[in-house]
Amino acid sequence: MRRNIIISLALVLMASCQEFQPVFTGDYDDPAGYEKVELQPTHTIAQLADMYVNGKPWTIDEEIIIKGVVSTTDKPGNFYKSFYIQDETGGMEIKIGKNGLYNDYKPGQTVYIKCNGLTLGMYGFKSGNYGGNGMVQLGYSDPTGEYETSYIEVPLIIDTHIIRGEIGDELVPEVITEADLPGTNATLETCPYIGKLVTLKGLKYANETFTLLYLDSNKDKKASWNRIFLSDKTLGITTWAMSESKMKEYITSGIWDSCTVGSGSDNFGKVGSLKGDGSYPTIEKAAYSVSQYFKMGNKEIQIRTSGFSKFADTEIDPEVLAGNKTIDVTGILTLYQGSVQFILLDIDGVKVNE
């Protein structure tokens, strides 16, 4: 069946521009043992997040220490150069410019962060009728100005600011209901589940996907000329994401032959014509993030998965896709432009209800 896919600008504005990247998921040598460290936190995670002012990243110039427990791992490949910590008040992403963070920051491990000199910013805020809050992050200042925070790259800065403490039991996810989900302008003060490891039960497939393609992923990922969006109920994507090989499989199948780009970008209305070698003009065959949409009651949940994750090409149960079965999911609850997003740690975070 030939398909024309017209994507409204409103849908485009819901897309994330900070995309997943490849993650090393092999094994490193065991790290050196941890010294027992106990620092006195001055602020909770929510108190630190509350110090952020929209649109104004802050390079912290106060002696602030926060304490949290690591809730994520990048070993399955669905997190890139960052991990989340949480306390009783909420969770926060810590951006560190290195792969294989699971080797140093283990789920259940206590981490103290000396915030002076680091930068507090938000990813995913948008004003206006179709906007809302994003996620407050802790990282380093971005000299390019492209994002409010960048990665902490220098090993000395990492070691003197991110202090590893005791390794304890892994966190038990909190089971939350539709009523607990964050609203458009939610903060940790109004929704302490943001950034935390949680379980959502009884999600029903919403029969919609969202896929972002780049013409050149090495160039400006915010530029309209470099971004193509596919969002429709008939794209035929039945996996959680797409690896490079799966992406090529979809392209060569011809299922997207008549896709009309409608992203409000420089490519609006243009149709990619499949070439004899099984490629589209200018579109990369690389791994990208895919969002599969589910419903929790009346609330839409966007589950984002990296094409570099180990479970990217895992098929979603056909009975789930058909709407005959629901799923329970465990992962990190986030916001992007006021919309609820969800990031799985691994495929074990998906349970099909019989």
Model-based region annotation:
Residues Q18-Y80, Y84-T110, K114-E354:
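OB-fold nucleic-acid-binding modules
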Residues L13-S16:
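C-terminal motif of bacterial Sec signal peptides marking the signal peptidase cleavage site
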